[in-house]
Swiss-Prot record:
Keywords: Ribonucleoprotein, Ribosomal protein, RNA-binding, rRNA-binding. It comes from Parabacteroides distasonis (strain ATCC 8503 / DSM 20701 / CIP 104284 / JCM 5825 / NCTC 11152). Belongs to the bacterial ribosomal protein bS20 family. GO terms for cellular component: cytosol; small ribosomal subunit. GO terms for biological process: translation. HAMAP family: Ribosomal_bS20. SUPFAM superfamilies: Ribosomal protein S20. Binds directly to 16S ribosomal RNA. One of its GO terms (molecular function) is structural constituent of ribosome. This is Small ribosomal subunit protein bS20. Pfam families: Ribosomal_S20p (PF01649).
Length: 84
């Protein structure tokens, strides 16, 4: 266990940040799963900007790497465009 007040606070902050990041990352993963499962093109086109926005926010906050966000958005765009 940490001895200094500042390190105790830092551990507390890190844990809170980790939980927050996990929540937002999981929410985005679930949204991507829903988008990939959609077969209706109109519904997918409505969901796509929301999911892209989530990914951009995660990349901006360094929860995921910006290149990973770009790759995921690209794959999702391919999926949406492939729907009939």
């Amino acid at each position: 266990m940490a001895n200094h007040k500042s390190s105790i606070k830092r551990i507390r902050q890190t844990n809170a940040r980790r939980l927050r990041n996990r929540y937002y990352a999981k929410t985005a993963r679930n949204a991507m799963k829903v988008l990939r499962a959609t077969e209706d093109k109109n519904e997918a086109q409505a969901l796509f900007p929301k999911v892209c926005s989530m990914l951009d926010k995660l990349a901006k906050k360094n929860v995921i790497h910006k290149n990973k966000a770009g790759n995921l958005k690209s794959k999702l765009a391919k999926h949406v465009n492939a729907l009939a």
